[in-house]
Amino acid sequence: QLGKSVRDDGEFFVSLLRTFDRDLHWNYVAANKDPEVVKKLLLNPGLIPGFNDSGAHVTNMAFFDGNLRALRLAMDDSEELVAHMTKRLTSEPAEFFGLPPVGVGVGQSADFLLVDPQELACYEGESTIRYEYRDLFGCHQLVNRSEGLVAGVFKRGQEIWNGSGFTDLSGREKLGGALRALPS
């Protein structure tokens, strides 16, 4: 019966909503569908990789993690490209935004994450989307989780994520701060 009197795609969609109401769920790739085009853009020196959203939108959107996907695309190419992509995702944006250069050295405070290369080799961002209830928001939400891929996150050298959850340090001790606006 559904769709027998439908005249166009819009009317069909409305009839689906009328029939299934809140039980109707779907997903689609909205952008960045072609990996070669994405890689070309990520490597363009005139562009800076930007903000990536992994599911902050309540209920209706769950984007893949663009930074992990960028590393995955680079991994398909070579170790040298992984190193270059890491620079594109970290020090190049920092330089563009006027953040002080940071290196790794004795006595320096380090922010870093550990990515499991075997998990990265298998990573497909679109396949990790789930619809789950979030107590924090009191509703269901689309989320994109890359479990097992990030083995640890460290802020000022202190582990705040251990690969399966936040550590006791997270949210208890101040480890960072907001960036200051630069005068225009």
Task: Locate the predicted segments by residue.
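Cofactor-binding beta-sheet edge motifs in enzyme active sites
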Residues: 66-70, 171, 178
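Feature captures the catalytic cores and cofactor-binding loops of soluble hydro-lyases/lyases
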Residues: 60, 64, 68-77, 88, ...
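C-terminal cap of metal-dependent C-N hydrolases
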Residues: 39-47, 112-165, 169-173
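Hydrophobic alpha-helix feature that most strongly marks membrane-spanning transmembrane helices
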Residues: 18, 46, 72-79, 90-94, ...
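Active-site neighborhoods of metal-dependent hydrolases
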Residues: 1-78
